[in-house]
Amino acid sequence: MSNNLTGIFNNPQGNNTFDMKIFFSVGEPSGDLHGSNLIREMLHRDNNIECVGFGGSLMEEAGCTLLFDLTQFAVMWFVNVLLNLHRFIGFARQAERYFKENSIDAVVLIDYPGFNWVIAKKAKRHGIPVFYYGVPQLWAWAPWRIRKMRKRVDYALCKLPFEEKWYRDRGCEARFVGHPFFDEMENQKQTIDQDFLTRQRETPGKLVTLLPGSRQQEVEGQLKWFLKAVTTVQRKVSDTRFAIASFNQTQADYASKLVAASGLNIEIYVGRTPELMQAAHCCLACSGSVSLELMYHHTPTVILYHVNRFRYFLGNHLIRSRYITLVNLIASANPFLRTKEVWHPNLPGGEDIPMPEYPT
C-alpha cells in the first residue's frame, strides 16, 4: 500500500521542486494511525516535505505540526455533531486562514467526512489539490453526496477493493491503494510484547477480549451492552476470563467504573490491543475496521453494535449496502445487493458470508 499511495503525492501541482507543504485533516483515532504511517513513509522518501494540519498524537509523533488535536472530537450521529458545531466552524475558519496565509501543495483528508467536506470546499476555493484517503462510504448510504466528491475532491484513494469501480463509474478520479490496516499488522510484528502475550496465553481459562471501540462516544454507548454479554457468557461457560482492550487511559478509566459497578471480574489494559487479540480464544468487538484486524489474526469474533430503535429505523431506510461488517463486504460477490438476509444464531453463514448478520 505505502509505495502505491505515496507516489501519488509527488508534485501534485507539477512543481519542479520536491519541497512541499501538505495539509492534513484527520479527526478519528483510526485516521490518526493511518495518517501517521503515511507521514512516516512520505518523510522517509523526502524529508523536505512539511506536514501540518489537524490530527492526533500519533501524527504529531510522526512529524506533523498540529494546529489542533481533532481526534478528541471524534463524534457520531447528528445530535452530537450539532452539540459541537461551533467548534467545527472555528476549526474550519482556522484552516481557511492557514490556506490564505501559506502556500499549500496538497490537502489530504482521512475519513471524518462531515467536517472534511468543508475543508475540501475551502481548499478548492484556494486552488489546492485535494486527496481523500479512505473515502466516505457513499456506496453504503446517502449516495447523492457523490456530487460533493466530484466537485471538491481531485483524487479518491480507496481502501476497499470494490470502491474504485464504484467511484469511477460515477465520474470520480479514483484509485484502490489497499487498506492500511494490513500494512500496520505487518509493522505490529516488530512491536508485539512477547512476554505479555506469553503470559496471557499461559494464564488458565479461555480469554475473551472485549473491543468496545476507539471513539469515546462509541465506548460510552456500547460497553454496557458488552458487559451484559459477559454476564451471560460467564453464567453459561465457567472456564472463561475477560479483558478489555482500551484505546487510551480516559476510556480505561470509564471502563473501570462500569466494571466495578457491574461486579464482574474483567481486566482492563491500555495499549495492549494487538496482544489481546492474538491471545484471545475469541473476541467481542464493536463494528468497524477492527473486524479486518481480527480477520488478519484469524481470531473468532462476534461483532456487536447497539443502536436505539430510532437509529435502527433510520439506518434501515438509509443504508444501501448489503452488510455492515467489513469482512462480509469484502467477501461478498455483490455487496450492494439490497436484500434482507436473516440467519438464525445457531446456523452457519450462507453463501460467501463468513459472519452471519442479524438484529437481536
In which residue ranges do the predicted regions lie?
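Nucleotide-activated sugar donor-binding and catalytic core shared by glycosyltransferases
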Residues: 3-360
